[in-house]
Structure formats: structure tokens, C-alpha cells
């Protein structure tokens, strides 16, 4: 079990409230999104992994926002491709 110093994580993010927001978002990603942790898991809970990632500067609000945007774009692109295939659109303008 890795030791997490919450204060280090707070210092990275700036305040405890934002830290909790970011850590919970990241923990949810790890839990539901099948995302691979950026640090060794060491049998830690998702929340602990999230805090460790933040503490090491691997996860910030900007990084999370950018990742979510990218995922949405990929999702939309995949859906668009699927709809195009079903609609039998053979004229792809990319």
C-alpha cells in the first residue's frame, strides 16, 4: 500500500476542494473507463491511485479536461462512422 501525502497533492492542485473534485473524476475514470493507472497499482483503491497520480503531477484538471475532450471526439468519430456505414454513404468527404 503506497503512502499518500494528501498535503502534497493539495499543494499541486492549489486547494483541497479542487483536489477532491479532480481526484474523484479521475477515480471514476479508472473505475468505469477501463483506464490504466499512470502509477503502479499496488492493490490501491482507485481513489488512492488518483491521489498518487495527482501528487506526482501526472493528472491535473487541464489533463483531465483534455483527455475527456479527446475521448468525446473519438466517440463521436466512431459513431459518425457507424452511422455512415449503416446509411450506406459511399461518398466519404474527410
Swiss-Prot record:
Signal peptide: none annotated. InterPro entries: DNA-dir_RNA_pol_omega, Pol_omega/Rpo6/RPB6, RPB6/omega-like_sf. It catalyses: RNA(n) + a ribonucleoside 5'-triphosphate = RNA(n+1) + diphosphate. Pfam families: RNA_pol_Rpb6. One of its GO terms (molecular function) is DNA-directed RNA polymerase activity. GO terms for cellular component: DNA-directed RNA polymerase complex. Its EC number is 2.7.7.6. It comes from the Bacteria. One of its GO terms (biological process) is DNA-templated transcription. Keywords: DNA-directed RNA polymerase, Nucleotidyltransferase, Transcription, Transferase. It is an enzyme of class 2 (transferase). Promotes RNA polymerase assembly. Latches the N- and C-terminal regions of the beta' subunit thereby facilitating its interaction with the beta and alpha subunits. The RNAP catalytic core consists of 2 alpha, 1 beta, 1 beta' and 1 omega subunit. When a sigma factor is associated with the core the holoenzyme is formed, which can initiate transcription. Belongs to the RNA polymerase subunit omega family. This is DNA-directed RNA polymerase subunit omega. The gene is rpoZ.
